[in-house]
A protein has these predicted regions:
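Short helix-adjacent coil turns
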Residues: 74, 158, 171, 191, ...
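Flexible helix-coil transition and linker loops at the boundaries of alpha-helical arrays
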Residues: 149-156, 212, 222-240, 270-281, ...
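A generic tandem-repeat structural signature
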Residues: 260, 265-317
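A short, hydrophobic/aromatic-rich structural module that often spans a beta strand
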Residues: 79-80, 235-280
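Helix-turn-helix repeat elements of alpha-solenoid scaffolds
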Residues: 98, 135-142, 155-160, 194-196, ...
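Short secondary-structure boundary elements
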Residues: 3-214
Length: 317
């Protein structure tokens, strides 16, 4: 309080501020930075959160746009991302961010030399979001999703799940569906081949083991829906179907659901042969080999080992 008011700080004022804000640092800072000597502090304390609302309403459209974009992200946002999404001059943008920081709306930090911004308090973010229209929020989510998609370098579960979140919130059901399948396939690769004991994270899009088959059924239903709508490329859907069947077959073989797993592998072979997808054919024969190992059938192992080597050709020499 002394830092902001400099003078005129007396015990009654301190008690009045504490009673009005409950000692909430956010409300204290917003209240103190909004006082210009002419305002009645009693009126301000009647609805302390209105201070934030009034402060937001006084911002320029450009400054408000920055807050809207940052509100789409879960945490901190780098200055480079803001520059790319808002297509503003870097000097103009840094000036606006500094202005928002002085207003107590944003906080600034540096991570390994990267300048980042986030809301000074979650309550400010909540108020910003509450003032957005559904249309604006969907457009912002789509813009963020499209940007992250173009910048994607590492295929990780976290990167896929971030894309799923933004595409879903933006209303692009097909892109969300696509990354659900790719995320599931990557999870299957880790869990059922490389790290059999790995579990999905708490916030993962991948469901718990006991709900996995239902999840596969939902994705197959979505695939059928997209095919019937004819809005998406059939070639893209064919590729996603192969990835989905491959992930589901690995889950079934790994967990001893052999009848369903083998049926899926047979479907895979048919689809891959029709599309002349040699790389996936080889992977499918490898799944048959894993199946043969699990049930101690050397004839199955030998059969699919030979078929796989034939597809590989000279590469196995």
């Amino acid at each position: 309080i002394e830092c902001y008011l400099k003078e005129g700080v007396y015990p009654e004022l301190v008690e009045q501020l504490y009673q009005g804000t409950g000692g909430n640092p956010l409300l204290l800072v917003q209240l103190l930075t909004s006082l210009d000597g002419s305002q009645d502090i009693t009126k301000l304390l009647q609805d302390p959160y209105s201070i934030i609302t009034r402060r937001l309403s006084s911002l320029s459209p450009e400054a408000r746009q920055i807050l809207d974009v940052i509100s789409i992200f879960a945490g901190k946002v780098s200055f480079d991302i803001l520059t790319s999404l808002l297509t503003k001059d870097a000097l103009e943008l840094i000036y606006l961010c500094e202005h928002l920081k002085q207003y107590g709306l944003l906080s600034e930090s540096s991570d390994s030399g990267t300048l980042e911004y986030s809301f000074a308090h979650d309550q400010i973010k909540s108020i910003v979001i509450s003032q957005q229209t559904e249309a604006r929020r969907r457009i912002l989510h789509l813009r963020v999703a499209q940007y992250l998609e173009t910048q994607q370098q590492d295929t990780t579960l976290q990167s896929y799940e971030t894309l799923i979140y933004h595409f879903s919130a933006g209303g692009n059901r097909f892109k969300a569906f696509k990354y659900r399948i790719l995320s599931l396939n990557l999870y299957a690769e880790l869990c059922y081949e490389l790290l059999p004991t790995l579990e999905a994270g708490v916030d993962s899009e991948v469901p718990a083991e006991d709900n996995m088959l239902n999840f596969f059924d939902e994705l197959e239903h979505d695939l059928t829906t997209f095919r019937s709508s004819a809005f998406e490329s059939s070639q893209d859907l064919d590729k996603l179907e192969i990835v989905l069947l491959y992930a589901e077959s690995r889950y079934c073989i790994h967990n001893g659901i052999y009848e369903k797993g083998c049926a899926l592998l047979d479907r895979l072979l048919q689809r891959e042969n029709a599309l002349h997808d040699t790389a996936m054919l080889i992977k499918t024969h490898l799944q048959y080999i894993y199946y043969g190992v699990q049930i101690y059938r050397t004839d199955i192992i030998e059969q699919h080992l030979q078929l796989g080597m034939t597809l590989l050709g000279d590469d196995v020499c």
